[in-house]
């Protein structure tokens, strides 16, 4: 069975000072369906946003972000498991940092746990350990983490569900004639200098971090699919019907 990593960004599952329970509900229903066809690993963001629903402190302060992540991570996992239970599924939490992937021993231990979870029908739910991962908390929104997870945990494909519904030849928020690129086989260096960002305070990623993730995966003969996390129809059609009706495939 093909193994995939699904990464969902903070922008998709949080809004204002709360989690978007409707989008989380739709996401989990989608994941449950995917688990019938694939070995699925979820990489989730939004621990800080989840913490902010419980404690209203300034989230721009780095130490406050650490505190919010520490509060929010167990709450976020509990929400996932409450929703997964409706499909007779269980999620297991794995907290990692970029440094864990620098150690082959740590990577192997994590992979062993993930392999066993999948064998037992459990959904591995990975998040960055934002309470300690200072570098990652500042910029990235788990895009790099999800790329590393795809490579080191032997997945074939990374699916990023984002508020960015694909890669465009120019910034679609500034140019009405911007065209979405359906397939990309090579990441141009000038693209990595782009300044197209997401429009929410709830995450730290943008198109550049996603392109860097795609570049890493292409260099390791893996694929990445970027699609909207707000409207899951594109991702559903791609993964469940093997048709591309939107998004951008990096292969």
Curated annotation (Swiss-Prot):
Pathway: Amino-acid biosynthesis; L-proline biosynthesis; L-glutamate 5-semialdehyde from L-glutamate: step 1/2. GO terms for cellular component: cytosol. It comes from the Bacteria. Keywords: Amino-acid biosynthesis, ATP-binding, Cytoplasm, Kinase, Nucleotide-binding, Proline biosynthesis, Transferase. It is found in: Cytoplasm. GO terms for molecular function: ATP binding; glutamate 5-kinase activity. One of its GO terms (biological process) is L-proline biosynthetic process. ATP binds at residues 7, 162-163, 168-173, 204-210. Substrate binds at residues 45, 130, 142. Belongs to the glutamate 5-kinase family. It catalyses: L-glutamate + ATP = L-glutamyl 5-phosphate + ADP. The keyword Nuclease does not apply. Catalyzes the transfer of a phosphate group to glutamate to form L-glutamate 5-phosphate. It comes from Campylobacter jejuni subsp. jejuni serotype O:2 (strain ATCC 700819 / NCTC 11168). The keyword Nucleotide-binding applies. Its EC number is 2.7.2.11. This is Glutamate 5-kinase. Gene3D superfamilies: Acetylglutamate kinase-like.
